[in-house]
Amino acid sequence: MNEKEISEIRRRFRADKSNITHVRGCYINEKQEIVSQFDQPLSLLPQEECENMLSVLRRTLSGTLGKNLIEMPFTTAQVVDSDEHRLLMALRDSKLTDEEAVRMFFEKVIASYRPEGTYLILLANDTYDVPYRAKDGETLEDASENIYNYVLCTVCPVKQTKPVLGYDVPENTFHNRDIDWLVSAPQLGFLFPAFTDRSADIYSAMYYCRSASESYDEFIDAVFNREAPMPAEEQKTTFGTILGDALNDACSLDVVQTVHSRLCGMIEEHKASKDPEPLTITGRTMKTMLTACGVPGEKAEKFEEACAEQFGADAALSPRNLVETKKFEIETPEVQIRVDPEYSEWIETRYIDGAPYILIPAGAGVQVNGVPIAITHPDVEYEEEE
C-alpha cells in the first residue's frame, strides 16, 4: 500500500462514508481477564458517539509509512493453508458474524499482548465499493471498479482518569469529578487484507504500531506468524552503529554531515514530488553514497556487508527511519550540541595546539542561560565608561 491508498481507506471512517454496521469489542483487565464483550450497532449510537468510535478506528491508519505503518506480507504457503491466514479470512468473509472466529481471535490477542493496564480490542468490517479512477487521477463515484471487503483491528489502552475538581454551573460550586475510564489512542492494530493497487491483497496486511521503538514480537508472531520487523528507532541506532564501526577512523564529521544532508535531501525531494510510493534505500545505495563522500572502497564495502547482516540482504530501508530531519546533534561525555540541520555545515573539527576541538562560528545574538553575552577579540581592550 502507498500513502494515497492508505488515505483513501482512512477517509472511509466517517459517518457519511462508512458502511460499517457494527463494531465487535473485548475489554480486558490488568490480569488479562475478559471483563466484557460487545457487538455494538453504530446505527443505535448518537451521532457524536458514532463519530468518536470511527475516529478511534481511523487512527489505526495514521502515522508514517515505514515507521508506524508497516506492510506484513504472507507467503503463498500461508495463504493456501495456514491457521493464521484462515482465521483472518474467516473474520473478513463472515463480516465478523462468525462467533468462533471472533472468540479465537480475541483469545489469540490476549495471549500475545500483555500491557501493564487494561485495554480494549475493537474489530470493524467495511465493504467499500471502490470508484473507478481515470488516468488523469479523477475519481468517478458512479463507476465502480471492485468491492473491497476488509476488517480493521484496533487495540487501545483504557486509562483511569485522575480525581479533579469540576465546576457545577447550576449550583455554582466546585465538586470532585467521578473517576472514569477513558479509551486512549490505539497502541497497535492492523488492516486486512491490504488495499494494494486499490484492490484487496490477501497476500498482505497493513500493521500499525503507535510507538517507533516498540515491536510487539509476540503479537506479530501470533497474528501473522512471522518475525517482527525492526522498530524505526532501533533501525536508526543500528544504522549509526554500523556507520561508526565499519568506517572507523574514516567516519569523520564531514562524512556524517554529508550522509545526513543527502538523506534529508532525498526525503525533501520525495515529499516535493508527491510520489505516493514509499521512499527506500538499500545498503548498496549507501555504499555508493559513502564512496562519493571519499570513504575508502574497502570501508564502504564493509558497511554494505554489515547492513546486509543486520537488516537483511537487499533490505529496503526508509531514510526517515535513519536520520532526524529536524535535528543535528553532537555529543561528548560533557557537552551536547544541537544545531538546525540547515546550518550543520557551520560546525567543524580542528586540532589546536595538539588538542581536538569542535568549532562553531558565533555571530550576533549569543545567549548563555538566557543572558546576552559579548564575544570580544583578545586584542581588543575594554574602555571603561565614565
Language model region names:
Residues 291-386:
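C-terminal, beta-strand-rich globular interaction domains
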Residues 2-7, 31:
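Soluble regions of membrane-associated proteins that transit the secretory/organelle pathway
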Residues 14-326:
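Long, hydrophobic alpha/beta structural blocks
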